[in-house]
Amino acid sequence: MTAAQKETLGFQTEVKQLLNLMIHSLYSNKEIFLRELVSNASDAADKLRFLALSQGDLYQGDADLRVRISADKEANTITISDNGIGMTRDEVISSLGTIAKSGTAEFFKNLTGDQSKDSQLIGQFGVGFYSAFIVADLVTVRTRKAGETTAYEWESQGEGEYTLQEIEKEGRGTDIILHLREEEKEFADEWRLRSIVTKYSDHISTPVQMYKAEVPESEGEDGEKIPAVPGEWESINRATALWTRDKSELSDDEYKEFYKHVSLDWEDPLSWAHNKVEGKTEYTSLLYIPKKAPFDLWNRDRQSGLKLYVQRVFIMDDAEQFMPSYLRFVKGLLDSNDLPLNVSREILQDNKVTQAIRKGCTSRIIKMLERMAKNKADDYQVFWNEFGQVIKEGPAEDAANKEAICKLLRFSSTHTDSATQDVSLEQYVERMNEGQEKIYYVVADTFTAAKNSPHLEIFRKKGIEVLLLSDRVDEWMMSHLTEFADKQLQSITRGDLDLGKLDDEETKKAQEESEKEVAGLVERIKTALGDEVKEVRFTHRLTDSPACVVSDDNDMSSQMQKLMESVGQAAPEAKPVFELNPEHQLVKHLNDEQDEDKFAQWSHVLLDQALLAERGTLKDPTGFVTRLNKLMLELSK
């Protein structure tokens, strides 16, 4: 392909949006472009090293992998070169012309227009190569794939299109030439570049080199000749795998910068754990808990997992086999001495070494969270606000660690009456009333709906704390969380209410008397409502409301039905149990109503009100409005 055959291709729409966003949102942190490009170059070296394990000829006599940075002040350019894996034509187009990653639509949907918030999102998304356009108005990429003879040149001004052509290139790998904007000349200074590499990329295991100019022959103070020192490429980073170094010699800043390298996050992590395990299974783990949840945490196609190394050789990204799904937010890496270098995802799936490492890493994260909850409550609250809903998947997924996970759970509660989820099950148990045998909770669509649930009335009256649950995952979680500290967890919206020792004899007698006053009402309402309800009965869980609906112990709760329907699954129909407050004036008036038509209308209105309070929706809202209007019209006469 000659220069005349240069192709002009258009960027994918999302790339254009991303480039525009970066230039306007990331100008306050421009120097990160070098971190991103050096990180990419190091990854290219890692990938070649892995492939060369089985295809040694890919090295072509050049096995010393490195990244080189040079600056030309006169031309106002920076060049970042690597002798890593390189790219084919198709890989150039897919890597530099499109964003081929899941969650792209979610990313753009989450943008707010607030530059500080958007810059955080861009960091989570991982811009990599495109960060070059923060400082450059023209970027040239020359690349040759290892094992191939054809090379390609990609060039763009970061606007709507790019050019692509075949070129001659001596060695494999990729050269990225940044033609700096006039106002970004400071980055064409070698000392400036060295300081950025030291700041952000000291931990990169691939040597990052810059050219040290020749020192000519000179004379010393006593007239002796000092021989010339030839120019050479010298490493300006440590070029040792950070995780292989002793914890005692690593600073917090080094751990934080390494986190940004492995996670593509731009924020500091919340916490981390660095461990070397010896014995039957030998491995090193460096695990991080992020400060912010990624925007695509709930995307089913999202890739998660740890970077996997075997004997310090990079094997794969996103090795999900080492963490349970409820810890999918954890970032970091594993370096195993026991796995084979030719390990595949299939081999990892049913491997005893994998299972031992997974068990150890899971335990380590749980202990890290336990320490944080105990010693750094504010940090733990930050963590819970971001990742609490994911942790709530734990009791169902991980029976072996269920008790420990339960101690990490946090809830809203009537004790605080705040939407903030900061009450632990241990705190609840410590505050339980004398004679209280169960941990009570209510599940609703929102915190406000839970807080105002009529089912809470008797509990507020008696001063019994109730956990207020309103996350989408809560009903499913509670179906797997039935006991804690030998106390049964009881939904206050299921089954007949039994407060056990918390009910005194005097109260029970008063309740029985109030039921006698409206004897026969239950049967009349059963007849009026027919098969709309499973059962009608009196209750003493209410103090201010006339009626409520509850789920039978053996039926699926209304919240679980909603959850199943929201994910497209058919939920078995479960009719509610309709409960009446015999002490409420409306119920007494209903008992006195002799007109059976009006009686039926009022019965339906009471049921619909109770269903609205419990579920927030009605199957027939028009029928409810019609009945209510009719009754109000009659009352106004």
UniProtKB/Swiss-Prot annotation:
The keyword Chaperone applies. Keywords: ATP-binding, Chaperone, Cytoplasm, Nucleotide-binding, Stress response. GO terms for cellular component: cytoplasm. It is found in: Cytoplasm. Its main location: cytoplasm. Pfam families: HATPase_c_3, HSP90. InterPro entries: HATPase_C_sf (IPR036890), Heat_shock_protein_90_CS (IPR019805), HSP90_C (IPR037196), Hsp90_fam (IPR001404), Hsp90_N (IPR020575), Ribosomal_Su5_D2-typ_SF (IPR020568). PROSITE patterns: HSP90. Residues 563-637 are annotated as: C. Belongs to the heat shock protein 90 family. One of its GO terms (molecular function) is ATP binding. Molecular chaperone. Has ATPase activity. Residues 346-562 are annotated as: B. Homodimer. This is Chaperone protein HtpG. Residues 1-345 are annotated as: A. PANTHER family: HEAT SHOCK PROTEIN 90 FAMILY MEMBER. HAMAP family: HSP90.
